[in-house]
UniProtKB/Swiss-Prot annotation:
NAD(+) binds at I179, D199, R204, L266, G267, I268, I290, Y291. Keywords: Cytoplasm, Metal-binding, NAD, Oxidoreductase, Zinc. Zn(2+) 1 binds at C42, H67, E68. It is found in: Cytoplasm. Its EC number is 1.1.1.103. The active site is at T44 (charge relay system), H47 (charge relay system). Belongs to the zinc-containing alcohol dehydrogenase family. This is L-threonine 3-dehydrogenase. Zn(2+) 2 binds at C97, C100, C103, C111. Its cofactor is Zn(2+). Binds 2 Zn(2+) ions per subunit. It comes from Rhizobium rhizogenes (strain K84 / ATCC BAA-868) (Agrobacterium radiobacter). Pfam families: ADH_N, ADH_zinc_N.
Length: 345
């Protein structure tokens, strides 16, 4: 194996990514080196491409980015015991310290020292990625590479959707991006009574409808209260999944929740936006922030959903070779795509 590899690198502090040859990551005693088969583009990667304010203060330059992937093990460290070369795997992109109070209590997803693959350390937009043995997740043979490559965002959807009991509940999802759509699919699969998804992008709403979400609402043209009445809802929503990061959508969600409603918040809203806290108080709403996946219960549930027949592959709208990465990023930046999966070989 050569000691150099192709990779997409944030090599300059400006808009874009560049295909370069960089050293293959070194494998420590507890590490696993994975040959990447497929990578998917995340919204985080778009922020890094755009070199926005968050990226400028977060991403060291140069950096191999990316964190959504599927591949096969190419090399294992001297202390690795669970895995073998050739095994097909994905991996958890949040690397936790294992020493803080939350980690020691089995709540690794709450680790205050979390490092992100492709954010704080080299990522998966390369021919190889290296992660700790504890972050490796084996992929069953009946799950395709491209589906395993989007398990990171699917995990965000599963974690958010399953934050509260959904059986018989009326669920509002704000934001019909890939994670919002998958969250709505999980809610429907998990026994929700009514699942309504809102957005202002007709292409995303069309994709949501194609994937089986019965009630899609263009918030720029339709009144959500009228839609609720038309589908037989006489009270507010029991559960809200805020996936958009859009302040108007969040405010509308709070307004349409039933008393005692529960909201899981994954979307990252702009700084300084306002909500009516009086409604939160007097409706006695329960708000819960969501970040990443519960390790590794969410992964177990994802695999169970897919093996049980939940088909999330139509969320993938673009499949491209890695040399066409610019096309993939333009699709993501347009806001009119679902997931974009890039093939490394």
């Amino acid at each position: 194996m050569s000691n150099m590899m192709k990779a997409l690198v944030k090599s300059k502090p400006e808009v874009g990514l560049w295909m370069e040859h960089v050293p293959v990551p070194e494998v420590g005693p507890n590490d696993v080196l994975i040959r990447v088969r497929k990578s998917a583009i995340c919204g985080t990667d778009v922020h890094i491409w755009n070199w926005d304010q968050w990226a400028q203060k977060t991403i060291p330059v140069p950096m191999v980015v990316g964190h959504e992937f599927c591949g096969e093990i190419a090399e294992i460290g001297s202390a690795v015991t669970k895995y073998h070369v050739g095994e097909r795997v994905s991996g958890e992109g949040h690397i936790v310290c294992g020493k803080c109070r939350n980690c020691r209590a089995g709540r690794g997803h709450l680790c205050r020292n979390t490092l992100g693959v492709g954010v704080n350390r080299p990522g998966s937009f390369g021919e190889f990625v290296c992660i700790p043995e504890s972050n490796v997740v084996p992929i069953p043979d009946d799950i395709p590479d491209e589906v395993a490559a989007i398990f990171d965002p699917f995990g965000n959807a599963v974690h958010t959707a399953l934050s509260f009991d959904l059986v018989g509940e009326d669920v509002l999802v704000t934001g019909a991006g890939p994670i919002g759509i998958m969250g709505a699919m999980v809610a429907k699969r998990s026994g929700a009574r009514k699942v309504v998804i809102t957005d202002i992008n007709p292409n995303r709403l069309a994709l949501a409808h194609k994937l089986g979400i019965d009630h899609v609402v263009d918030a720029s043209k339709e009144n959500l209260a009228d839609v609720m009445k038309s589908i037989g809802m006489t009270e507010g929503f029991d559960v809200g999944l805020e996936m958009s990061g859009a302040a108007p959508a969040f405010r509308d969600m709070i307004d349409k929740m039933n008393n005692g409603g529960k909201i899981a918040i994954l979307g990252i809203a702009p700084a300084g936006f306002e909500i009516d806290w009086n409604k939160v108080i007097f409706k006695m709403l329960n708000l819960k922030g969501i970040y990443g996946r519960e390790m590794f219960e969410t992964w177990y549930k994802m695999i169970a959903f897919v093996q049980g027949g939940l088909d999330v592959s139509p969320v993938i709208t673009h499949r491209i070779g890695i040399d066409d990465f610019r096309e993939g990023f333009e699709a993501m930046r347009s806001g009119n795509s679902g997931k974009v999966v890039m093939d490394w070989f």
